[in-house]
Amino acid sequence: MHISITGLSDQRFERPLQLIANLFFEESHIYFNKIDNADISIEISLEQIETEVTVTGILDSNVPLRAEHRAVIDLELSEKEQFKQLKNAVSHVYLMLLQELTGMTQKWGILTGVRPTKLLHRKLREGADPETAQKELAKEHMITPEKAALMQRIVDRQLAAVPDLYSLKKEVSIYIGIPFCPTKCAYCTFPAYAINGRQGSVNSFLGGLHFEMKQMGSWLKEKGIKITTVYFGGGTPTSITAEEMDMLYEEMYTSFPDATEIREVTVEAGRPDTITPEKLEVLKKWNINRISINPQSYIQETLKAIGRHHTVEETVDKFKLAREMGMDNINMDLIIGLPGEGTKEFTYTLNETEKLMPESLTVHTLSFKRASEMTKNKDKYRVADRGEVEKMMELAETWTKEHGYEPYYLYRQKNILGNLENVGYSFPGQESIYNIIIMEEMQTIIGLGCGASSKFVHPVTGVITHFANPKDPKSYNDNFEHYTNEKIKILEDLFSEANEPASI
């Protein structure tokens, strides 16, 4: 789909308009000039009188389509923020034209970002009441009432689960990345390396990780900075041996400040084929209070197609084993839109989930991530169309509501099927604090281990900077000391006395 757009000279419009085009068309390219082979031609004009700007768009078709939007530009804002307001006004017109042309309604409006609930949190922190905040978001971004209400439900749940969410900037959370898995799934782009035959690499990696944990723990103790949550992800953290897990958790309790006061420790035991009684005993020994066991689907043919070499029965058996051994906060992940699946298969998966009733359930919508096996071979992995994916999401919403689950976090991804979202549900009181913190970007998260990203949130301005460890084990093993020291330098500046929040 080739889209010609005339009337806009600023190249900063290109990316947001391309992202909106992607909501409607699987393969689309936009051009800021007239082209001969355009499938869609749109002319946009801007007229600004003092603070008011009028954006008009005309889409050339058999019957030309026209849309108009007026907006007020706050001239006291920075040039960057003024452009943002102008960009939103242009996006309104562009979206209206494409919706009228295709007959498709985008429930998230012009929003293409990952964290829509963050916008609602911002308005509430600025003093808006919930009803006003919802109306403003709907107007500013063309969000449907249905999605605005979902955002409000999630924000309410988050603030009930973490009442001090807005004042956690003086603490940190820790993400620990363990980059090994039994096999790599077809949809995955996380740092994940088949563990078989890599014991030498595993040993070197674990040596580097222990170093990072010691050094970072020492610095946090010296500065008197508390840890809110710890999350072991990957990869599959339970791919390593029970003895190796035991040594890691001992390191956490020895090196991290006030480890017994950490509010939540999560371990992704996502692949059932990595779970053993010995590993569950280790988790129990160290009071690990939240784990994930992820079926993704209860259709065996699907698991085989996506490269998960475990059986459905193994998922059920390992879940029951974890329950018998005292694990009382288990999350499970399901994915909507996996190859070969439709509403029938997803209904079956929900029915099987009902037999287990985990404390939380994360419902993902399949996303075609650029580097995944599935994206590189789309012809091989046939997936449901937009309409069927929406029906599956509706099934998930209905099922979770009927079974007492509440939505508590939400995020979106680029190239996600049906322009939908990923939603975390839980029983009230069983929400993952880490998931809330990372999605709403309320505090610094320090990434340790291979492929782990750190997200540094400035305690006063809220400005976010990123820092990533190498994704491949060899690069990590060769340079972990350097990356540890670099993170500590950033933290030294971030948590200097000059940067302390005045309100805390």
Regions picked out by a protein language model, each given a short descriptive name:
Residues M1-T132, P163, G424, P428-I504:
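Radical SAM enzyme core and accessory elements
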Residues I30-K34, A38, A371-L448:
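A C-terminal junction/extension of Radical SAM enzymes
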Residues T102-T105, R125-E126, P130-I174, K223:
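N-terminal [4Fe-4S]-dependent radical SAM core
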Residues T112-K118, V155-R157, P191:
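Short, conserved phosphate-binding/catalytic loop or strand-edge motifs used
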Residues E171-L206:
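Canonical Radical SAM [4Fe-4S] cluster-binding loop centered on the CxxxCxxC motif
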Residues G177, S292, L361-T365, I436, ...:
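Beta-strand scaffold of nucleotide-dependent catalytic cores
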